[in-house]
Amino acid sequence: MALHDENVVWHAHAVTREDREALHGHKGAVVWFTGLSGSGKSTIAGALEEALHKLGISTWLLDGDNVRHGLCSDLGFSDADRKENIRRVGEVANLMVDAGLVVLTAFISPHRAERQMVRERIGEGRFIEVFVDTPLATCEARDPKGLYKKARAGELRNFTGIDSVYETPESPEVHLDGEQLVTNLVAQLLDLLRQGDIIRS
């Protein structure tokens, strides 16, 4: 810990998370999408956000590529940088949950330890891990950004699923078949959010 930590004290605010949730009419939570590149994380997260918005739910979508344009623009793809990337995203997501939002995150987040770190930061009941399980062959066939082709050609190192490991979730709240229709997957997620009392029926 830094030497100045003892002088940094958390400042509590008069307006609480519960106050903000009451204003929004729903609980704050994180829906954490994890899976290989091309698995469909961003597509499903975007469709879910659209569906939630239509229901009057206050949301925010944190996307893996987007945060690297600003918040994490100084980070690369080493194990240490990936860990820091997820730590920062977890902290931002936690602030947004405190604001009463339903936060959707779409990150490969290949390591269980980092996902567990965010889970512990957010708290049980507010962290919903969604494993988008799509076969590597399907992800490669989709290859929307041409990254698998570059990785296979040796032009891109430390690419998850090719020469960098992806640790599949052991007990995610939701296990989605990434080859199914997005509309069906969104319906499944909405049901889960209702059952978890995150959003109203």
Curated annotation (Swiss-Prot):
Gene Ontology BP annotations: hydrogen sulfide biosynthetic process; sulfate assimilation
Pathway assigned to this chain's UniProt record: Sulfur metabolism; hydrogen sulfide biosynthesis; sulfite from sulfate: step 2/3
Catalytic function, reaction form: adenosine 5'-phosphosulfate + ATP = 3'-phosphoadenylyl sulfate + ADP + H(+)
Ligand binding (ATP): G35, L36, S37, G38, S39, G40, K41, S42
Name of one Pfam family that matches: APS_kinase
E.C. number: 2.7.1.25
UniProt keyword annotations, A-Z: ATP-binding, Kinase, Nucleotide-binding, Phosphoprotein, Transferase
Family matches, as InterPro entries: APS_kinase, P-loop_NTPase
Top-rank taxon, per record: Bacteria
A single MF term (Gene Ontology): adenylylsulfate kinase activity
Record: active site: S109 (phosphoserine intermediate)
Function: Catalyzes the synthesis of activated sulfate.
HAMAP family membership: Adenylyl_sulf_kinase
Entries under NCBIfam families matching the protein: apsK, PRK03846.1
Sequence similarity: Belongs to the APS kinase family.
Name the UniProt record assigns to this protein: Adenylyl-sulfate kinase
Species in which this protein is naturally found: Citrobacter koseri (strain ATCC BAA-895 / CDC 4225-83 / SGSC4696)
